[in-house]
């Protein structure tokens, strides 16, 4: 059988007390022996490969050595992969060569990204020492490999000291067949062993360890590039962008992240983008199941509590302090539990799996179709027309109407990031800039409204809160006028599509 070009794999973490149960499961499936895997990850002095989403390693697998190149794709669960057996004996590290991968898709991607890179530019940057228990599972429609890994990642610090981090994880890899079978098996592990998705590779964790980075930066949104305008490309690119942002930021929060504010914000952005994307997907008859929609709404609402209190901590209290407000006690994010328990919950993890399943099914069912583009443009027109109507009476409508307008314009903003390639290049940048100005002003207004609602109950307990209430009401009036001005500027411009 020819080697796969692309790896599809789902990694799961779990409470440590579940390790034995998972190990017994693999033993029952034929994973009777553990294999020691000792790998050296190779990179430039400034980690050019890692920063480009590329992992290059040489690994001792029992008595044999294998050289592997992995290149990230736009999908967090899929990577281009090429394995080359090395003729070498002994424990010493064999000679490696990038040239061995040049004719493979992974090698071609590497040289597109880094055309001047040479093997002589590389050296060992970090290592892994892993014991793996693996079992091959034949399921209806696919052959999978379960791999339970335990061990350590090692890196040398600049002062010569060795740093280590423990590894304990389960990988479910598709060897052949239907990707959705991987998701079905992952669901079982989530339900039975309280497992949860983790997108961080050993290479990424090794890079962080070697460079002294405590946590990878939050993944932020950016305008997408559509290679073609067929339905599969649009659906896959947009939905993968949303779920990647959610999963990657969630994985960092789950890694005992103390200062999680920005990662949590970007997780919420990913979920909002997903909501917007699914409204467009409905045009192609792609929908959430009711249970998933309920889970998303509930999850988003609970995460919203952190966002609301962040406004009090980071914006309101500093502003009150600058205005020489008397001391007062307001609710704080510090009063809330760490959000990892919420993210790791079974309902949320099954929701993530369902989204991945929606993408896989949509990719199967929309091959060679090109119905989506005109539907998208028509929907953009509708959103623009509806919001303009409300904007024309902005100073007279209720706060609820203003809130709905804000959400619709946020949807338009995310849609333009999805569908930049459907817009006029000359008008896009200025249009988006003005839309961001409107969104920021309306966002400020909404934050103030939420803050006023939250402190209302505190007024009788702490008379100093009257100061905060008065300051907020004055600020609310100012931002209302600002929002109206931004709206007029925005709608005076031509559409970008």
Regions found by a protein language model. Give the residues of each.
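Function-determining surface determinants
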Residues: 1-497
